[in-house]
């Protein structure tokens, strides 16, 4: 009897079937969003309502859902001047956030973000480097439904050294609170190079068709992850400047069958 109990206790472990193994989580595309950016600082002409109407027509044709703009000039107290931010928001039926960089005698300069999705919050930061004058970074958190998307619209100091640019990028990276959340940076970003301060970003230029990157008025970097990837990218010419356009895929984890 003792021998029988000993053999029973040493019997082979039960066979594990495929159905007993937990299913692996696979990212599943749940939403695609189109993000674009443009820098108006080099436009050099007064922007009229008709210019904004034509620009809006292009945005609608391209189905842009989030737009980051740099180099905006506003005259809020001059009634004869068309306000770019307010007029574009009306034309596109978009929410918007504006980050003022400087105000000189009623002439405001700054950056903005427009979105068809609700804007949760916005925050502005100045750059603490010697070459900075009035340059700032505008961070906007957008509720895209399946997850929040963070967009930064910025003008970096034009005369910044390599070390100063690295410090500016660290300032921008501080906006990113969750490593898995979609994070996009737009503006006069430097030519991408491998360094500890830049390696957390991916330059959209690698996804653009050959030659089109030279047309960009505003560059786009992003933090790529398993749940946030570029689907396609291109540039689009407009009278106000060349748009950099990126379609991003937002993914969620789903179990395999």
Show where each model-derived region lies.
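Sec-dependent signal peptide recognition
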Residues: 1-2
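C-terminal motif of bacterial Sec signal peptides marking the signal peptidase cleavage site
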Residues: 7-9
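Glutamine-centric residue-chemistry signal
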Residues: 70, 84, 164-168
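Proline-aspartate-enriched helix->loop->beta-strand connector
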Residues: 63-72
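Hydrophobic alpha-helical segments
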Residues: 33, 65-66, 86
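Metal-dependent catalytic neighborhoods of phosphoester/phosphodiester hydrolases
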Residues: 72-90, 106-108, 194-200
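Active-site regions of metal-assisted phosphoester/phosphodiester hydrolases
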Residues: 11-62, 95-98, 102-257
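A generic structural signal for ordered alpha-helices
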Residues: 66, 92-93
